[in-house]
Amino acid sequence: LVVGGSTGAVKVNNAVRAILPELLKKYQVVHLCGKGKTDASLNGIDGYIQFEYISDQMRDLFAISDIVISRAGANAICELLALRKPNILIPLSANASRGDQILNANSFKEHGYSSVMTEEEITPEKLLAAVDDLYKNRQKYIDAMDSSPQSEAVDKIMALIKDCSK
């Protein structure tokens, strides 16, 4: 699953498209490109589907995904941690943001939850190597997320809701 955020991520989209033939030898790719950023020439390629944006079916896409390439916004990283999805985070650059995504990504990398690439270092070759490495080592990332103090947060919240509803 490739998620570039609601507006898409041109550098990520371009890098994914450049390595698509190689990716499709091993993986099926669901690509959320951003509004107006799909590429009609790629429609109908076996193993690849692209959307501008998905909202209601996002949970289903996360459920079927083994790995995720994503921006590093607060909502995205919380979902990735809660769902234990091995991921490559590509934060918005400091020039295009307040820098919060960079802080989020670095924190997740330090905890062993994520692999991180900056926009400036993305090349098709580096992205392909990062995807292959993430997939090969995905259990390491899942184990790190399982050991997170936040790993039981959903269970604790559900227990509180049940207690309050009695």
Residue ranges and their predicted role:
Residues 1-70, 102-105, 110, 117-125:
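Donor-nucleotide binding loops and adjacent catalytic segments primarily
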Residues 63-78, 85-86:
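Acidic donor-binding loop of glycosyltransferase active sites
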Residues 70, 86-98:
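Short hydrophobic beta-strand element within catalytic cores of glycosyltransferases
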Residues 139-151:
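A short, well-ordered alpha-helix in the C-terminal region of glycosyltransferases
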